[in-house]
Amino acid sequence: MNKSLFKSGCLVRTAHVILTWIITLILFLHNTDLRRCQERGDLLQPLVFSSVLLLSVLLYFTVSLMDPGFVLSDSQTETASGDGDEELEAMIPQEQNSIKQRRCGYCFLLQPMRARHCKWCKRCVRRFDHHCPWIDNCVGELNHRWFLLYLCVQFTAVCWGLQSAWSGFISAPSWQQWFTQNVFLLVAFAVTAVFSVVLLLLLCIHAYLASVNCTTWEFMSRHRILYLKHVDSEENPFDRGVFCNLWSFCCVCGTVAWEKMYIRHNNASV
């Protein structure tokens, strides 16, 4: 990545950390459930909350900084051949047919099926889902499961923060006094409320996509994707049932030979 992208990534990640700790400080400095537990010496709830928050930050940086599944150059592909698809090949019968890979019009690399060039990362990404500006990274074949796990943990932390902010509001004789006394908690409540809605939507969407083995890009742009254009609109050549889809999504590490699955589906349909 070039320097401007690196700087923008640092800016986004710094903003995420600062916002996280500002909200946390507000919750612990006001008379919330977390603060009251701390004052009583009951440290279990504050410690669990802090642990969930720390885990969310660690997962954020994991998803943000890890390789989402960048397509290797031709020379790198030859070197790494035979290392990535062993687990999937044991699950999918070998087919004699083959699908010719196309070259990317931007970076001129051979694109595996379901890969797409990201204009922000300036690289092709395997099983491209989308480019997420909040993590300043693509969500692809290698980090999609971690992205979904991050959404789960972050949603838990945000909802907990929302409830804690609500518990800290204090009454006052007038609206002006109430606003003055609760302004910081009100900001924390508003921020966590917005983020909880966004995270819930993302969580539901990506859980559904994982269960049907589809990506955001395929779902939104099916009519533009060559390998899906001639497939019935209700068909998904990569769908092997909810259990197998979730097992593959969560437990199969490395890259997947999607071409073999696609050929198997086409042969079964004939």
Curated annotation (Swiss-Prot):
One of its GO terms (biological process) is peptidyl-L-cysteine S-palmitoylation. Residues 102-152 form the DHHC domain. Residues 30-45, 167-182 are lumenal. It catalyses: L-cysteinyl-[protein] + hexadecanoyl-CoA = S-hexadecanoyl-L-cysteinyl-[protein] + CoA. GO terms for cellular component: endoplasmic reticulum; endoplasmic reticulum membrane; Golgi apparatus; Golgi membrane. GO terms for molecular function: protein-cysteine S-palmitoyltransferase activity. It holds the Pfam family DHHC. The chain crosses the membrane at residues 9-29, 46-66, 146-166, 183-203. It is found in: Golgi apparatus membrane; Endoplasmic reticulum membrane. It is an enzyme of class 2 (transferase). The active site is at C132. Keywords: Acyltransferase, Endoplasmic reticulum, Golgi apparatus, Lipoprotein, Membrane, Palmitate, Transferase, Transmembrane, Transmembrane helix. InterPro entries: Palmitoyltrfase_DHHC, PFA4/ZDH16/20/ERF2-like. It comes from the Eukaryota. PROSITE patterns: DHHC. Residues 1-8, 67-145, 204-270 are cytoplasmic. It is a multi-pass membrane protein. Its EC number is 2.3.1.225. PANTHER family: PALMITOYLTRANSFERASE ZDHHC12, ZINC FINGER DHHC DOMAIN CONTAINING PROTEIN. Belongs to the DHHC palmitoyltransferase family. The DHHC domain is required for palmitoyltransferase activity. Palmitoyltransferase that catalyzes the addition of palmitate onto various protein substrates. Has a palmitoyltransferase activity toward gephyrin/GPHN, regulating its clustering at synapses and its function in gamma-aminobutyric acid receptor clustering. Acts as an inhibitor of the NLRP3 inflammasome by mediating palmitoylation of NLRP3, thereby promoting NLRP3 degradation by the chaperone-mediated autophagy (CMA) process. This is Palmitoyltransferase ZDHHC12-A. The gene is zdhhc12a.
